[in-house]
Design a protein with these regions (language model features):
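Phosphate/pyrophosphate-binding catalytic cores of soluble transferases and nucleic-acid-acting enzymes
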Residues: 1-155
Length: 155
């Protein structure tokens, strides 16, 4: 984030009370909470993410339910959208309250992190996806066994 506005960051491990505290702070400051949780961005990922149900929210909760689980979503996409939300709040004279436990997501917003734009191709992944199609799961497992028997034993 640029130096023209302050932010509040409430971070910590799962079930440490971040959501409750961030809501209290945001309510007192009459602002919004911006989630920095890599799982809460996905629609339908309500179980296991401790996502505050819509009907229980006392302040706006941003960057939640903004991506489909079946679609590609990257930290760069999150960074762009979350920074835009934060700047809207700052421009309105409000202090964004970031809340969550995904350090990379928070760092991508508050630090000067740059990511390549567009889709990043993974030649290694592409190669092994092609091998999986050709050899099937068993054949791929056999290939793993020739390269790393100990890891193959674990699978």
């Amino acid at each position: 984030m640029s130096s023209h506005g302050s932010v509040i960051c409430i971070v910590g491990p799962t079930a440490s009370g971040k959501s409750s505290l961030s809501e209290l702070v945001a309510k007192k400051l009459e602002t919004s909470v911006i989630s920095v949780d890599a799982m809460q961005v996905y629609r339908g990922m309500d179980i296991g993410t401790a996502k505050t149900p819509v009907e229980e929210r006392e302040v706006p909760l941003l960057m939640v339910d903004c991506a489909n689980i079946s679609e590609e979503y990257s930290v760069q996409m999150f960074q762009t959208a979350a920074r835009a939300e934060a700047h809207k709040l700052i421009d309105a004279g409000k202090t964004p309250v970031f809340c969550g436990g995904t350090g990379l997501y928070l760092d991508s917003i508050v630090d000067q992190m740059e990511f390549p734009s567009g889709s990043v191709e993974s030649p290694v992944r592409t190669r092994y996806e092609k091998l999986a199609e050709e050899l099937g799961p068993e054949g791929l497992h056999e290939l793993l066994a020739t390269k790393d028997a100990a890891s193959a034993e674990l699978i």
